[in-house]
Regions:
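Catalytic-loop region of hydrolases
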Residues: 1-62
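Short, solvent-exposed loop/turn and secondary-structure capping segments
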Residues: 19, 49-53, 74-78, 123-124, ...
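Conserved alpha/beta-hydrolase
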Residues: 56-76
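Alpha/beta-hydrolase active-site loop
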Residues: 83-104
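Alpha/beta-hydrolase fold nucleophile elbow
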Residues: 105-115
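A catalytic-pocket lid/entrance helix-loop region that shapes and gates access to the active site
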Residues: 130-219
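Alpha/beta-hydrolase fold active-site neighborhood
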Residues: 188-260
Length: 260
């Protein structure tokens, strides 16, 4: 395939184009103008670049990865406020882009993304239903409020009881008896990997990772991983290794937070 980097000039406010513009970044994998076109969203920056996503591979399709407005390079030189960072404005961005791509590609248009990318694909379809033929949204967690109280009873209802008990037991162990050891191990890992923790300090990052452990386990691992939960008597290194696999402390590192 051929690979292109593309910048689309977009209004900051589609209802008031006189308020200025920004350049929205996208990357194109071009195979064939008659093949399907996949519009791929992350909901954040463009970290796919030239990597073909699952839907693209399945359909041997063209692919356009669209960076979300106001993330990474796709932002105005100066942002007076964030009022135009809305799902409707983003959907309008994607409508502009889809309209352009329809002039170039004759095949079916598919739209996809995971997590906030899945949500983004749904929002585009909600405002501009005729832009794509198919929407394949992976993991689109549309919350109703902050906080959304539906999550807690849902978590209570999934997974074997003994598995949940062991998972919660090591959370308690980590925060009551292993906190200092985990912070030491996380600090060593940060030094080795060149990570900094200035927006959220390291002790808070460790605590956040432990608190998020149950959520992350059921989101990314599932019941098949129950046998791999270490005992409360496991070594500090074993507990830290498990934490890093399931709910990484580095999620709160400066470089990672900058992406979101």
């Amino acid at each position: 395939y051929r690979f292109f980097e593309i910048w689309f000039t977009q209004p900051i406010d589609h209802a008031h184009p006189e308020r200025g513009t920004f350049r929205q970044y996208a990357t194109l994998i071009h195979r064939d103008p008659t093949a399907p076109m996949v519009l791929l969203h992350t909901g954040y920056g463009n970290w796919y670049y030239d990597y073909p996503g699952e839907v693209t591979r399945l359909y041997h399709a063209n692919q356009l990865v669209i960076e979300h407005r106001f993330f990474r390079t796709s932002r105005p030189a100066a942002i007076a406020d964030w009022a135009s960072l809305t799902i409707e404005q983003a959907a309008a961005d994607h409508h502009v882009i889809a309209t352009v791509m329809h002039r170039l590609y004759a095949g079916a248009f598919l739209e996809t993304g995971a997590s906030k990318g899945g949500m983004t694909s749904i929002y585009h379809r909600r405002f501009w239903p005729d832009d794509v033929d198919v929407t394949l949204a992976y993991v689109a967690p549309i919350s109703f409020a902050a906080p959304d109280y539906r999550y807690e009873p849902y978590l209570e209802g999934i997974g074997p009881a003994d598995c949940k008990a062991r998972l919660r037991a090591i959370q308690v162990e980590m925060l009551t008896n292993r906190r200092a050891a985990l912070q030491t191990l996380a600090g060593a890992e940060a030094t080795q990997e060149g990570r900094s923790y200035t927006r959220i300090d390291l002790p808070a990052a460790v605590e956040s990772a432990v608190i998020s452990l149950e959520w992350a386990f059921w989101q990314y691992v599932g019941a098949d991983g129950c046998a791999g939960i270490p005992a409360v008597t496991a070594t500090d290194d074993e507990l830290f290794a498990f934490l890093q696999v399931v709910s990484e402390v580095g999620s709160s590192a400066d470089a990672n937070l900058a992406e979101f």
